[in-house]
Amino acid sequence: MRTTLLKFVLLFSLVLLNTSLSTGQIQYNNIRFKQLSIAEGLPHNTINAITQDNHGFIWFGTRNGLCRYDGYNINLFAHNEADSTSLRHNFITRLYNDSLRNILWISTDQGICSYNYETEDFSRYQIKGNTKDDVCFLNTSDGVLLAACSNGLYRYNEQDSLFVPFLLDEEKPHVRYLAEDGDKTLWIDTNKGLMRYSLEKKQFVSLPTLIQPFTLQCNNAALISSNQLLFNTNNDFFVYHIQSNTLCNLSKDLEVKDFRCAATDHTGNIWVGTEYGIFVFNKLYQLIAHYEQSERDLSALNDSPIYSLYQDKAHNMWVGTYFGGVNYYIFGSDQFQIYPYGASFNHLSGKAVRQIINAPDNGLYIATEDGGLNYLNNKKEITRAERLHKQMQIYAKNIHSLWLDKDNSLWLGLFLKGALHYIPHLNRTVDYNLLSDEVSSGFCIIEDKNDHIWYGGPSGLFLIDKKKANSRPEKISSLRVFNLVQFNDSILWAGTRKGSIFQINTHTLKVTSLPILPHTDLYITYIYPDSHQRIWIGTDNNGLYVSDRNGSIIAFYSKEQLGSNAIKGIIEDEMSNVWVGTGNGLCCINSQAGSIDRYTTADGLPINQFNYSSACKKPDGELYFGTINGMISFYPEQVRSVNPRFNIALTAIWSNSEYMSPNNEKAFIPSSISELTEITLTHEQAQSLRLEYSGLNYQYTDNTQYAMKMEGIDKDWQFVGNQHQVRFSNLPSGRYILKIKASKDGIHWDETGQKDLAIRVLPPWWLSPGAYLVYALLFLLIIYAAYRYTKTRIILLMRLKTEHEQRVNIENMNQQKINFFTYISHDLKTPLTLILSPLQLSLIHI
């Protein structure tokens, strides 16, 4: 069966190629899949359903839980017997994003439930009489949510949060699928056949004549666009075009006769998921691609049985498999054709691709540093080194440079083994290393107008005279030459290491220095004259310079613009754009528009690091670049210049190592983390705060660059690279605004997807308004106490003073009395003495 399928893929490969080249959109023969499995955090590798919510998160329904993917982490939601607000059951059968109500509907093996984004919990629902729990949801064009289940159709009553009957007849058929076409007609797939219901007329309408014979045989259906119905019978699967009233049997030439799921990509082509992989049909219903599991190709599907297909808002295709978890194709990753290294058919024999040159028969010679010489014909079939080396008598595998001379003879520059000359019409190879007395390397090789072959490397610059048979290589200079280019009929330019650029007169063999560059310690890797009389000079340590023919620098491109200071290869396309392979991606420079587009692994490159002197343009305009892990080719007009959109969302908040959510009693989260615009923190919570976030761009997840600014702390934007979390410690009380924005390259920033989060940090209890009130009351109390104390003291002092004064007065009065009586007694004593004395004398004499 697989052999037959392969034949059909090959049969339609020409159609596929023409389609991809003419549309310039998806190159289906170059699609590569990435994978998410248990190793990345999935709870189960069987994926029954996939959808994307309003925020941009991708949801996976597995056999063991519900998962939310943000590009970095997989967040698992599982059933908990003790929690009625948890997921109803871990076996998920369908997912539906209700964009009108911002609700995720989940059909499980034990009934349905919905995920509430504001509270981050689940609500459970009952549909009376539903015996089978595979429920299909649909929002009609009128905004009515319908549920198709085992006993008919039900409508969601939003006010009462209940499902009520809709279009139920007495027989109550099992409705397996429900969809609305562009004419506001419902297509209803039931166990009793296919039906149609007009929402405008509010009545059932007859089926088109073409599909009436199949209605009772239909056992699976899917409306893959507003005008195309895919349905499966016992023997085949068909697509019915509603508008044109045409029917096509997609499986007539296939051994596969049924499908499980289907979706359309942004071009309108149909992806059909089957037990034997994915079949892609174009708008003419011709098979143009087949993807299945491959043990030899890691970028193929890792499992063939397909259970779900989904196209997200960015045109990425998500594939749910039975054993392989999630496979996904990133839109745009197909624009570069990859020629990988490996032992398999049509793989390069070497990993590090060095120089690539055009061959006489519209093919390419490809030099590798670790696998010898390869040849690519015009059908893009690779002849490996094992065969070529035997034919050409080549013994070395480390080939650094190639040159096809005027006679169509091939010259090879080798590492530490000089140069080889292969003469096709004689089938003879001349080894110039055997003719030389000095060890040399051919890092670059070129022919001048005088039939001289020049090659150079770390050990110097050498000359071979083709006119002389078995001519010994002549050492012209000890310069460490890494690049040679013909400037005019008699002048070569040589790029050297730590010696800048030198000019070589091919007649006089004189070598002179050219003071073009601002530094003399630059490692010149590539010199390229374009069609506008400009000389592009690449360095390995200081970016890219552009000179005019007079040697004046007219432009300079640095790491900030190119993503790397290491320039590996330069080539001009048919539109005068200059493509530059660097140590960190591929750049397209439009000097007229002043723009630079940079491409990385997120855009489909196999690796970001290109190799030296490895750029070539074929006569039809296709460009080839060598990397340290294989080779790529592309047509520049088909490469999309994309300024990706980001929608930054918070994915997790941690305070003092505790995860915060609306369901956490200690949390400060009033609603879903992803919907937060403002948070309030206590002093304790602000002591250690960690916020995780994602740009929700699944193409540039690994390369997304972030910048943030904390208004209230930062004056300028802080560029944090691909770090997708931020930590704060001991935030002082106050109000802040955290701003986060994203970019694919750190140069072009998407301001529209910026996230602003207002953060309010409450003061500690001893600095809170209540504390200040207490402090004020205490202060007033102290003032009052001081006042009372002072007043009491004053009164006491006054009383004491009064008592003292009274006592003094009494003492004074007593003293005055004593003095008075003393004076009186004195005054009385004197006369009495005068009276008594005579009396006493009288008495004595009596």
Regions found by a protein language model. Give the residues of each.
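Short loop/turn segments that connect beta-strands within beta-propeller blades
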Residues: 70-73, 116-120, 157-161, 198-202, ...
